[in-house]
Amino acid sequence: MAKYTEEQLFAIKEETSYVPQPQILSAFNELIEQVKEHAHQQQLQYQQQQQQQQGFSGIGSGVSGPGAQKWRNGDTYIDEHGHERSYHHMNRRRPSRSNNGEKKPFFNKKKTEVVVDEDGWETFTPVQHAHRGSIGEDGSEEKSKFRDSVSGSSGSGAGAGAGAGAASGSAGGVRARPNNKNLGSSKQVDPRQIASTKQTRTFNAFEALEGNDDEDDDE
């Protein structure tokens, strides 16, 4: 970066000082006056057009006075009675269906609970939803009840099977069958949706036919 002394800066200032020229300044002032006059003429012409348009609409529709000023576009038509009317009522904008941008309050939303301990510390606890019973204390209680019921049913089925035989004992157990709608998804199965079905021995037609053949041979 170039460095200058004070004497050099004063010399440069004298050399590059601006000297206004009177002919250029007068031409510039005349141009400004012409622009102002042109803008004033345009404003007067616009006001005259607006007044003529309002008067034409007021006469054609039979409306005069302040009520005729609301029709400013000048687009009119002849109705079935021969009167000239404006299209103003056809250009009205429909009201918005989004409640004018205002969001409706969500009354069903539950607030978070605040727990204050002895030291004064506040802890926010999330609200547990009713349909999510597998989370929280209610879900743990339901799980424990379901396990107890399954274990009790399986124990009784095993005891009955020991007295009747190995085949009947295996058939007397309890098998947990999950809900079919959740098999193809990664969502965890809710214990309340699991149906416990007790196995029963099905009827075999081939075994029945073989038993009849043996009885016929004995006869």
Swiss-Prot record:
Residue stretches of biased makeup (Acidic residues): 210-219
Region of interest (Disordered), ranges: 37-219
Entry GO terms, CC: cytoplasm
Compositionally biased residues, Low complexity: 41-54
Domain of life: Eukaryota
Subcellular location: Cytoplasm
Residue ranges with Basic and acidic residues bias: 78-87, 100-114
GO molecular function: eukaryotic initiation factor 4E binding; translation initiation factor activity
InterPro entries, alphabetized: Caf20
One Pfam family cited in the UniProt record for this chain: CAF20
Listed GO biological process terms: negative regulation of translation
Compositional bias of kind Gly residues: 154-172
Keywords noted in UniProt: Cytoplasm, Initiation factor, Phosphoprotein, Protein biosynthesis, Protein synthesis inhibitor, Translation regulation
Biased composition (Polar residues): 179-203
Biological role stated in the UniProt entry: Acts as an inhibitor of cap-dependent translation. Competes with eIF4G1 and EAP1 for binding to eIF4E and interferes with the formation of the eIF4F complex, inhibiting translation and stabilizing mRNA.
Family stated for the protein in its record: Belongs to the CAF20 family.
Protein name per the record: Cap-associated protein CAF20
UniProt organism field: Lodderomyces elongisporus (strain ATCC 11503 / CBS 2605 / JCM 1781 / NBRC 1676 / NRRL YB-4239)
